[in-house]
Amino acid sequence: MSSSRMPALFLGHGSPMNVLEDNVYTRAWRHLGETLPRPKAIVVVSAHWFTRGTGVTAMEAPKTIHDFGGFPQALYDTHYPAPGSPELAQQLVDLLAPVPVTLDKEAWGFDHGSWGVLIKMYPDADIPMVQLSIDSTKPAAWHLEMGRKLATLRDEGIMLVASGNVVHNLRTARWHGENTPYPWASAFNAYVKANLTWQGPVEKHPLVNYLEHEGGSLSNPTPEHFLPLLYVLGAWDGQEPVTIPIDGIEMGSLSMLSVQVG
């Protein structure tokens, strides 16, 4: 990564409780914020904004969305008042053309997939942000190609942060007691790590075809938490380092794996 080029990050966000807790994952997020070059703006792709078509937040002051239930009141009392950037939102509309991108001026904001990690990285909430939705109607290869389009922003001081979990099966999660990963979750997590720097035709990429892995569908019964990774892999230039700043599996079937490009 050149001194002026921003990294691209995929962060495994896990439980909303990470907002309130001090643990190995939140400390790693804080360390990233303290050691990476400070961006002039951030584009976030979160698993929690899964839409038909593509949208981007385009308001001056996006709201903090508490898109979860059954947690302590302190979590609902927490807000992340980072400024929006209508100018950056319009830049994304132009950059991603001919893909139609809707400017969202009131409906969405920053959901816990975005603010839940960035509140640890940049607790002062003073970096302009926009959030880009994930089009639920498109195949995996399309999302990797979107990452390629977004890569040019990295040379303009803009950081790409994608947030999800490469293993995300809440039906099998061990909510209490034993925290041992399921063998299939560990195997799929290892498969992801082994293929981060694969190069070849997009349609043949092992992580575009992640459901072909024997643990793919069990690790991801729905695609929205896996797809954000593909945006970051698409932003890789094929030569810069790809590292794993954070790894681990919580509750048996929730991967906290994070990936840094650049």
Regions found by a protein language model. Give the residues of each.
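Flexible, glycine/proline-enriched loop segments at strand-loop-helix junctions
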Residues: L75-P83, K105, S133-A140, G216
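Solvent-exposed alpha-helices and their adjacent loops that cap or buttress functional pockets
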Residues: S2-S3, T35-L36, M121-A125, T152
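Short, basic/glycine-rich phosphate-binding loops at helix/coil junctions
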Residues: L9-F10, D67-P72, Y122-V130, L207-V208
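Short glycine-enriched loops at secondary-structure junctions
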Residues: A47-T51, P62, G109-L118, V166
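Surface-exposed, charge/polar-rich loops and edge strands
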Residues: D94, P98, I127-P128, S136-K138, ...
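Internal, conserved structured core segments that host functional sites
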Residues: A89-L144, K149
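Beta-strand elements within well-structured catalytic alpha/beta cores of enzymes
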Residues: P7-L11, A41-S46, L132, L153-V166, ...
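A short aromatic-anchored loop/beta-hairpin motif
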Residues: S2-L103
